[in-house]
Amino acid sequence: NKNTFLVSIDMPAGTVLENTDRVARAIGDYIRRIPEVKDYETFVGTGSVMDFNGLLRGGAFREASHFADIRVNLIDKEERSLSSEKIVLAIRPDIVKLAKEYGANIKLVEDPPGPPVRATVVAEIYGPDYAKQRELAGDIRALFAKTAEVVDIDDSVKEKQDKYQLVVDKEKAALMGISTEQIVQTLRLSVAGMAISTLHRPDARNPVAIMLRLSKADRTGLADMDK
């Protein structure tokens, strides 16, 4: 019966920070209505404050835009009738349903009574053929999903990343008087940004770079390149 638990949110790899934040806010809005909750803190794009349990579970590697954690603090156990375990069990169905609406995978993690472990049940697959490992991992995950009392199923299989290559139509660009270099620089400026000048502030020792680039809302996907 602890005074805290963690909600771990995993979105598909490549999800922009704003979409991950949207899921975290929705779950946070639900959590704030729970009478036994004292307060909570949300970490988007990074893991929660590291503890021994998080160290063993790989919390140090949750540095990406598709990760979020919500650390929930409960009122003292002397002031509530429900244990932290019963609270987590009661809210789990609603949080899982809410997460699925956004395509998120969530885990509700309580501090273990004994030494921390990666998970209650862990299946490890070894072999020289990674494709076969991925296939077996999917089969085992499906088996876990059918097993009673097994929740928060996850795996370490890396999602495939799409790679796009933009090819410049040099003939059309030449007819419009635009060089390939100009097109590349414009794309780079739009997505990655570019320092176009510096700002000299009287209260700062070093000059501050002025960056020019599109807002995050205008560079979330390949379709934005057509604008």
Language-model segments: which ranges?
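Short extracytoplasmic/periplasmic juxtamembrane "stem" segments immediately C-terminal to an N-terminal membrane anchor
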Residues: K2-L17
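Surface-exposed amphipathic alpha-helical segments in non-transmembrane regions
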Residues: L6, N19-D39, D51-D162, A174-K227
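Small/polar (Gly/Ser/Thr/Ala-rich) solvent-exposed segments
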Residues: T46-M50
